[in-house]
């Protein structure tokens, strides 16, 4: 297959590079050792791909018109084939079973912060982050679930009776099916179009710059050659300063740390794992060295992905 051929080609390139390094003068031994370590780090994930599956089937949480479906279209294309699932974990299960090629799931909102369930689920299922995209969360009047993000609007329109609904797109679907002129919903423009609703007012959310960042999840490690963001997950030994030591590694190698999250390990009381995002490409020497040193200092360590920043 093409994947097997690419894997064999990667292996051959790595071997040729090692042979060339081995012929270098002995005075450069330390440099050779460092380069070999970098090559070995990349070789350990030699089965990685640089391109995505053509014409993929992509899963997301929600129904048609959800912001998650919009994220699928943003990352892949307007014509991408998608399938919605009731819960976040249903997407992971579908990916595990091979029912879909990729999953697109929210990881962070600029107003409300991290979506912790998806940090926990990607760790639980052992998948990889292969890309990300950001969606402008413009809540438009036609229905409900943007209540927390649109409270200012309702304060100014107190004659309305806001009622929570499970999902913005589901709210739009409900209003469309109810055909009751006294009902409205708050949802995306996409939902408005899909369910044939009339746009009453656009962008009613409090924060006009509100965005949600979505991650693209895969069973396989895919790293485009122009990747510029790395995600890792790890646990640490119970030693004073162990976390600061990990963070010092990023400073030592000039790696720009973007995000750090700590999450409790559900199966182990008072134990935590850490999720870190930093900028870089694993093919670069300083980045591969930083990854290697982090791995050496951690109790457990996993490279979640190296992909293009949104």
Language-model segments: residues:
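Domain-level signature for soluble enzymes in the chorismate/prephenate branch of the shikimate pathway
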Residues: 1-310
